[in-house]
């Protein structure tokens, strides 16, 4: 047995499923998950000594690559002054100044510890601000594991939500309406059915949890217009896209202004950080200045703030996003060329430093139904064969891939060459 296999066997006796987040268990592709010893730049190194070109990037945060010296040094320096104070610090102010400068729609920002905390808190704030209970989310979009968000659509887009996890009371789920991504008609129908009851729409501006599905040109502006028409708030969940699709996020890339924005992943530079913020009048409703409660023992802790501040300063440097886009475009085009040579139908979506690989005969993938029609079994084989080639992709057909500026064009070309060999065997 490999060392990963031995560790996985031991872990399953002590940790549910052997992992601390379900997708890491390889249940979406089968087999034994890799246990990682270290990471540097664009590479992961497992406990058995094998190196992999990494396109997971810790599920998004590692936009600069692993073990970036600026972030590492910032963490070490901060740790020497103490790990957590439970009191305000100068770095929290500097971090808030930087975030609000980089994302102009955020007049104010509140730091939390995860993307789930950010979305959960933003929805609570939207409900408190509007005095309404219902929310709209989209089929195939994921906004963390808060009870009101673990909801699937019923038999039709306008049916009241049904829990898709045990432990979520139906009374919670009934306030969540699930519409179809990239389908404005379904959203208008929801508003027309509940014109005075919907507090907010929450949306991934690029859906990254049904692989990678960008918005159609009119979708996000259409959501903004509907929120304005019916008096609801628009929450853009940039936990995945923030600072990755563009410096000011996908909202800037697509030219839409939300009322609230949720951030995570990159904002922490590899440490557990989330944030939410937006319009000053909305944020003023948050405790302690307003009645909507939110708190956190480790929110804004000095280690995480130092890591995030260092990361965002590096991400804001000229050329970072041009490099991300160039590398991702080259990878997408190369994979499509290699698949075409082998006669394998493939769609590769990409925006900024995100991409998604779909084995499908369809010409495009724009919604959850399109994603579900893809060949998952072929993806599973592709994943394991690429792993054997030393390429680490997301171990699920429903997760986006992530590029970093630490990837070289040689890494990209080696990945395409590996895919060409794999496609020939699929």
Curated annotation (Swiss-Prot):
Keywords: Cytoplasm, Isomerase, Porphyrin biosynthesis, Pyridoxal phosphate. GO terms for cellular component: cytoplasm. Its EC number is 5.4.3.8. Pathway: Porphyrin-containing compound metabolism; protoporphyrin-IX biosynthesis; 5-aminolevulinate from L-glutamyl-tRNA(Glu): step 2/2. InterPro entries: 4pyrrol_synth_GluAld_NH2Trfase, Aminotrans_3, Aminotrans_3_PPA_site, PyrdxlP-dep_Trfase, PyrdxlP-dep_Trfase_major, PyrdxlP-dep_Trfase_small. It is found in: Cytoplasm. One of its GO terms (molecular function) is pyridoxal phosphate binding. Its cofactor is pyridoxal 5'-phosphate. Its main location: cytoplasm. One of its GO terms (biological process) is protoporphyrinogen IX biosynthetic process. The modification N6-(pyridoxal phosphate)lysine is found at residue 265. Transmembrane segments: none annotated. Belongs to the class-III pyridoxal-phosphate-dependent aminotransferase family. HemL subfamily. HAMAP family: HemL_aminotrans_3. Homodimer. This is Glutamate-1-semialdehyde 2,1-aminomutase. It comes from Escherichia coli O157:H7. The lineage of its organism: Bacteria, Pseudomonadati, Pseudomonadota, Gammaproteobacteria, Enterobacterales. The gene is hemL.
């Amino acid at each position: 047995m490999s060392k990963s296999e031995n560790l996985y066997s031991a872990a399953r006796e002590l940790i549910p499923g052997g992992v601390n987040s379900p997708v890491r268990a390889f249940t979406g592709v089968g087999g034994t998950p890799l246990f990682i010893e270290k990471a540097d730049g664009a590479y992961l190194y497992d406990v058995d000594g094998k190196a992999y070109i990494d396109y997971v990037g810790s599920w998004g945060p590692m936009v600069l690559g692993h073990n970036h010296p600026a972030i590492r040094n910032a963490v070490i320096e901060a740790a020497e002054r103490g790990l957590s104070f439970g009191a305000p610090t100068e770095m929290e102010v500097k971090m808030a100044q930087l975030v609000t400068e980089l994302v102009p729609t955020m007049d104010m920002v509140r730091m939390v510890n995860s993307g789930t905390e950010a979305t959960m808190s933003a929805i609570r704030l939207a409900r408190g601000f509007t005095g309404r209970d219902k929310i709209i989310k989209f089929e195939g979009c994921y906004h963390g594991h808060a009870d009101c968000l673990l909801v699937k659509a019923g038999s039709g887009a306008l049916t009241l939500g049904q829990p898709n996890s045990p432990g979520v009371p139906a009374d919670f789920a009934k306030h969540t309406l699930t519409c179809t991504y990239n389908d404005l008609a379904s959203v208008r129908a929801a508003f027309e059915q509940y014109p005075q009851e919907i507090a907010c729409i929450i949306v991934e501006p690029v859906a990254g949890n049904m692989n990678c599905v960008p918005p159609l040109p009119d979708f996000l502006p259409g959501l903004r217009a509907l929120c304005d028409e019916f008096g609801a708030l628009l929450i853009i969940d940039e936990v995945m896209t923030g600072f990755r699709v563009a410096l000011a996020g996908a909202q800037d890339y697509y030219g839409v202004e939300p009322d609230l924005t949720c951030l995570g992943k990159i904002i922490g530079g590899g440490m557990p950080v989330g944030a939410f913020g937006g319009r000053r009048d909305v944020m003023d409703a948050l405790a302690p200045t307003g009645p909507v409660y939110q708190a956190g023992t480790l929110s804004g802790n000095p280690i995480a703030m130092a890591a995030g501040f260092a990361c965002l300063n590096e991400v804001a440097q000229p050329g970072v996003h041009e490099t991300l886009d160039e590398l991702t475009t080259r990878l997408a085009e190369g994979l499509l060329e290699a698949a075409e040579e082998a006669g394998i139908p493939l769609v590769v979506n990409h925006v900024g430093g995100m991409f998604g690989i779909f084995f499908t005969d369809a010409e495009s993938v724009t919604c959850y139904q399109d994603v579900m029609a893809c060949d998952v079994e072929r993806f599973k084989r592709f994943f394991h064969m690429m792993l054997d080639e030393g390429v680490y992709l997301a171990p699920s057909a429903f997760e986006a891939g992530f590029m970093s500026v630490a990837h070289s064009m040689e890494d990209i070309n080696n990945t395409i060459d590996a895919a060409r060999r794999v496609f020939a065997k699929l």
